């Protein structure tokens, strides 16, 4: 049976006190709505219909690359009204999963269970047992079957003792949605159309309402303010760290780790405190990441050790390499095996060969460096002429003396040596020594200036 995912994302989010629409607030490096869309795609839904309202243009622009049908809810007249807006584009057959743009972490496996259960009955929902159900709609059952959802303010004292609550996540046959949604009424204290009313309609039609429980409570938690957003962030990060530890990662402190994307890990990876991983990363066997490092869209091969406060973005690092502390690898940095990149070294759009080293205070941009070369402290590849970038090529077994400036485009041949303090503007031949500096002048018995007496 074909599946449609309907996402309600029209809310204003007043309590966020933000100019950014609520569903665009970030959680683990991705907008709230982005999490929901990602899950919908994992479910292989044939259609994703997103209902937008406040900040609609901004929301649509953010997800312009996604294959989504957008439906506007110009007036926010309740959850039932929001789903009513989809009827003109909602298929007549199949089943629809109803999700929320501010409930970002419902997992694929949980939703697949709901879809499977709902396919058998025509309607299903996710419920949750909680210790304190105050404020939530209660699930009223008879002989184990769902009979009604009673809002807290309308519940009897006996019903208020019920600890099973409505999460608002439903899966309903499209045929029934086309039948029930036009019948919704706004004759209530709020003057709104409630989606929960379809439960009573299902019972009246003699349908059994399937229900499942999520494995993790935070899967169905919504976000209304920044306190809830922060709390959900920490719950999610805790769960991600747990899953990585189950894969063999050792954390110095799992509570001080943030994953804002995906990471594939090998065996015996060690991660120190306050590490942030963003985008899509991969860490090989026995990789060690020091405290305070940031990794984004980076691959690090087996045995490499990264010391504290190093930053990676779009880098590829070979095996048994030593990096940091305070190193920066920018997009296009490609390091072979057994490379050393030391403190305050920046590498951008540069390939570095086997065993080469740049241990201190160096900028390597738009360069190609061969194997077993040594780049002295303070070396700079001068790659930018004010208008265009140019390439520096350094061969194998090259020695670059400290405080050298290599003005691109320039090539340093295999086995060449560049003397310290040189400004190299011409190609250097293989196995040669090149240096360029002013002649040293020494003045004997030099007297330093004295301070004037006031």
Curated annotation (Swiss-Prot):
Q: Looking at the keywords, is DNA-binding present?
A: no
The metabolic or biological pathway listed in the UniProt record of this protein is: Nucleotide-sugar biosynthesis; UDP-N-acetyl-alpha-D-glucosamine biosynthesis; N-acetyl-alpha-D-glucosamine 1-phosphate from alpha-D-glucosamine 6-phosphate (route II): step 2/2; Nucleotide-sugar biosynthesis; UDP-N-acetyl-alpha-D-glucosamine biosynthesis; UDP-N-acetyl-alpha-D-glucosamine from N-acetyl-alpha-D-glucosamine 1-phosphate: step 1/1; Bacterial outer membrane biogenesis; LPS lipid A biosynthesis
SUPFAM superfamilies hit by this protein = Nucleotide-diphospho-sugar transferases, Trimeric LpxA-like enzymes
UniProt-annotated stretches for the region N-acetyltransferase: 248-454
What ranges does the record give for the region Pyrophosphorylase, renumbered to this chain? 1-226
The signal sequence is none
Query: Residues annotated as region Linker?
Result: 227-247
Query: Which key words tag this protein in UniProt?
Result: Acyltransferase, Cell shape, Cell wall biogenesis/degradation, Cytoplasm, Magnesium, Metal-binding, Multifunctional enzyme, Nucleotidyltransferase, Peptidoglycan synthesis, Repeat, Transferase
Q: Which superkingdom, per the lineage?
A: Bacteria
Active-site residues, record numbering mapped to chain: 360
Binding-site residues for acetyl-CoA, renumbered to this chain: 377, 383-384, 402, 420, 437
Could you tell me the EC number(s) of this protein?
2.7.7.23, 2.3.1.157
- List, separated by semicolons, the cofactors it needs: Mg(2+)
Major localization listed first in the record, in broad terms: cytoplasm
UniProt-annotated binding residues for UDP-N-acetyl-alpha-D-glucosamine: 8-11, 22, 73, 78-79, 100-102, 137, 151, 166, 224, 330, 348, 363, 374
An example Pfam family from this entry, by short name, is NTP_transf_3
Q: How does it assemble?
A: Homotrimer.
Role description: Catalyzes the last two sequential reactions in the de novo biosynthetic pathway for UDP-N-acetylglucosamine (UDP-GlcNAc). The C-terminal domain catalyzes the transfer of acetyl group from acetyl coenzyme A to glucosamine-1-phosphate (GlcN-1-P) to produce N-acetylglucosamine-1-phosphate (GlcNAc-1-P), which is converted into UDP-GlcNAc by the transfer of uridine 5-monophosphate (from uridine 5-triphosphate), a reaction catalyzed by the N-terminal domain.
Protein name, UniProt field: Bifunctional protein GlmU
Q: Tell me what organism the protein belongs to.
A: Acinetobacter baumannii (strain SDF)
